[in-house]
């Protein structure tokens, strides 16, 4: 690929790059031989670096890998026989660059002798301390209503029973939820508990379900409340024996008929 119009590079004095001054030998071969005779480093020209697309703002080289002088006179000897470019477009290698690179390359660092330190002593593993019984959180205190009277304002949402080991551990970790009732709910539950005799029987299942839906209390919660307040409220009001007069009256009516 050749582009016309690219002349040989000329410096300010009008001398082409790479040409020897008139005072030197007439041919590059003679100069090279003279240099070799004087003991100077051999000068070589490698690949062509001429940019053939400089006018278009690109970068294209012809791919010539080494300068080969044309046979003929001194002017033709400065042109490459492979690419036709001037010798100054080829990369010059006079052997000094390799020497400079050798001087710039730092010497390999001397290996450092590692400092011998004694091995670290193994730390003793801490033994787990036995847990004392007083470190465990105490179980929540459950107030049991006494027979002296007084109504309770709270009721547990779970039935009382013999606490197992797992249940006791669970009680120690979480707080039991307690249902709070309004004064109207307490009055209605008290009246209904006295009506059924503070007991839940099978024949009263439908009545209990209807009452719980009306008051807004779950059946299990009402059952626990009635169990907790039976000894304190039921004994003082005498509600445990209210069914007996009713049963006696029904029997007397049947006998009269």
Curated annotation (Swiss-Prot):
Compositional bias segments (type: Pro residues): 106-125
Membrane-spanning residues: none
UniProt site (Required for DNA-binding): 226
InterPro entries referenced in this protein's UniProt entry, alphabetically: Homeodomain-like_sf (IPR009057), Homeodomain_ZF_HD (IPR006455), ZF_HD_homeobox_Cys/His_dimer (IPR006456)
Localization: Nucleus
PANTHER family to which the protein is assigned, alphabetical: ZINC-FINGER HOMEODOMAIN PROTEIN 2 (PTHR31948), ZINC-FINGER HOMEODOMAIN PROTEIN 6 (PTHR31948:SF167)
Domain characteristics, as noted in the entry: The homeodomain differs form the typical one by having namely 4 instead of 3 extra amino acids inserted in the loop between helix 1 and helix 2.
Protein name (database record): Zinc-finger homeodomain protein 6
One MF term in the entry's GO annotations: transcription cis-regulatory region binding
Recorded name of the encoding gene: ZHD6
SUPFAM superfamilies per the UniProt record, alphabetical: Homeodomain-like
Keyword Heme recorded: no
Keywords tagged on the record: DNA-binding, Homeobox, Metal-binding, Nucleus, Transcription, Transcription regulation, Zinc, Zinc-finger
Lineage, highest ranks first: Eukaryota, Viridiplantae, Streptophyta, Embryophyta, Tracheophyta
GO cellular component: nucleus
Organism this protein belongs to: Oryza sativa subsp. indica (Rice)
Summary of subunit composition and partner proteins: Homo- and heterodimer with other ZFHD proteins.
GO biological-process terms attached to the record: regulation of developmental process
Ranges of the DNA-binding region feature: 174-237
Region described as Disordered: spans on this chain: 1-35, 106-182, 228-257
Biased composition (Low complexity): 21-35, 141-155, 242-257
Function of the molecule: Putative transcription factor.
Major localization listed first in the record, in broad terms: nucleus
ZnF (ZF-HD dimerization-type) residues: 45-93
């Amino acid at each position: 690929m050749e582009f016309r119009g690219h002349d040989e590079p000329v410096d300010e004095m009008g001398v082409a790059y790479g040409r020897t001054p008139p005072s030197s030998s007439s041919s590059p071969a003679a100069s090279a031989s003279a240099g070799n005779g004087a003991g100077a480093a051999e000068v070589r020209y490698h690949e062509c670096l001429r940019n053939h697309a400089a006018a278009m703002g690109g970068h294209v080289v012809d791919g010539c890998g080494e300068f080969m002088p044309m046979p003929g006179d001194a002017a033709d000897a400065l042109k490459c026989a492979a690419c036709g470019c001037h010798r100054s477009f080829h990369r010059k290698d006079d052997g000094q660059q390799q020497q400079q690179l050798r001087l710039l390359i730092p010497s390999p660092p001397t290996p450092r002798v590692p400092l011998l330190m004694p091995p670290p002593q193994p730390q003793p593993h801490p033994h787990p301390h036995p847990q004392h019984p007083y470190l465990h959180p105490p179980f929540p205190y459950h107030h049991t209503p006494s027979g002296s009277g007084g109504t309770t304002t709270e009721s547990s949402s779970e039935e009382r029973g013999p606490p197992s080991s797992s249940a006791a551990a669970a009680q120690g970790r979480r707080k039991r939820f307690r249902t709070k009732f309004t004064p109207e709910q307490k009055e209605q539950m008290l009246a209904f508990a006295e009506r059924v005799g503070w007991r839940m029987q099978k024949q009263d299942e439908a009545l209990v379900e209807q009452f719980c839906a009306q008051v807004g209390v779950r059946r299990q919660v009402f059952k626990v409340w009635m169990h907790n307040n039976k000894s304190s409220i039921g004994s003082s009001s005498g509600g445990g024996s209210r069914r007996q007069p009713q049963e006696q009256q029904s029997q007397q009516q049947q006998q009269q008929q």
